[in-house]
Amino acid sequence: MKTKLMIMMLAMLTLTACNNDDEPNSRPDVSLENIYLAVSSTEEGIGDRVITAKGDIVYQCDSLTWIRRFLADGRDWYAVVYNYNGGCQVIKNGNIIYSSHEEEIVDMCVDDGNIYTLQEPFPVPVRQEWLCKNFTHIYTLPYEQFKSSQMVVHHGDVALAPSYSREACYWRNGELVAMQGLEGDLLSCYIDTDGDDVLIGINVDKNNRTGYWRNGTYNELENTIIYQVKLIGGKSYILGNRYTTDVTNQYHGSARRITADAIIIVDGQEQVLRTGDRRNLAYSMIQYNNDNYILVRELLQEARDVYETVTLESKSFIYKNMKPMKLGNDITKLDIIDFAIIDK
């Protein structure tokens, strides 16, 4: 099974729709038919697919492809699909609207009808990265100082979080912006903006610590991995997990087992979504009609030592306002890559 859960990969996966948190009043009610799920394949010869939360198949990928990014904009859904042989495609409502064997898409947002993508060359003859609008290059990013991981776009205002920055900074509308109060290298970050309000989750700071930065104030977090940050209605939301690591000896080797609680931190107040003897993570959040929907993923991770390998078994849940929803038959047994809510 494709894990897609390593920190540096998560820096490239990240958020659900970039512009689906605004103007909720005219939206229809949410049902299982308009919650769409990008689901990882667990069967040989069958690719990833898009299904409804009820279980109906919307789109089936080819056997040699997998979904890297999934989002919605109004009535439309989009997926960035990668090919194991190289190259990528952008799918809109089941139709290919972009294809390349020379560039790969790191992240994508849809804003006011425009498609924004972070793209880099494939294979990589030079270190280069571009911000594109409707698949046309509009900015060349300063790769030696800043490598992006994830972006947000709000009415043409583009901000990028670093997967790596030489000095503590983020990129916004063509310029690197220093993060007041921080210095040194940063790794694996996530960003959201609301005008002058800027929130950045940082998985590795110069002291190898995790924390989040908001408008010059930095808060460190213990034993935490961040998977998404959001600014909604003036409140900050940090999604991730709080983990513990146990080291034991068995089969004459060193074994490690990681367990974690899926958490959400709202304006500094932590709430546990899911706990247990597994690795749980709050992975992606959408606000729709003033309700919060959160994807929670659960992994069973066996011990690793010189005699054993790691076995991952996934379960996935959608929480609505902190409570798990009842989904279609066997949906929770699937490995959900990400989810989106479609206007019907």
What are these regions (language model features)?
Residues 33-43, 76-83, 113-121, 157-163, ...:
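Short beta-strand elements that form the blades of beta-propeller/WD-repeat-like
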Residues 56-61, 94-100, 136-142, 175-181, ...:
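A short beta-strand motif characteristic of beta-propeller blades
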Residues 63-74, 102-112, 145-155, 184-194, ...:
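Repeated scaffold domains used in trafficking and secretory/extracellular systems
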Residues 314-344:
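Blade-level signature of beta-propeller repeat domains, shared across WD40, Kelch, NHL, RCC1
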Residues 2-8:
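Sec-dependent signal peptide recognition
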Residues 23-63:
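An edge-strand/N-cap motif at the start of beta-rich repeat modules
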Residues 14-17:
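C-terminal motif of bacterial Sec signal peptides marking the signal peptidase cleavage site
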Residues 44-50, 85-90, 123-130, 165-169, ...:
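Structural motif
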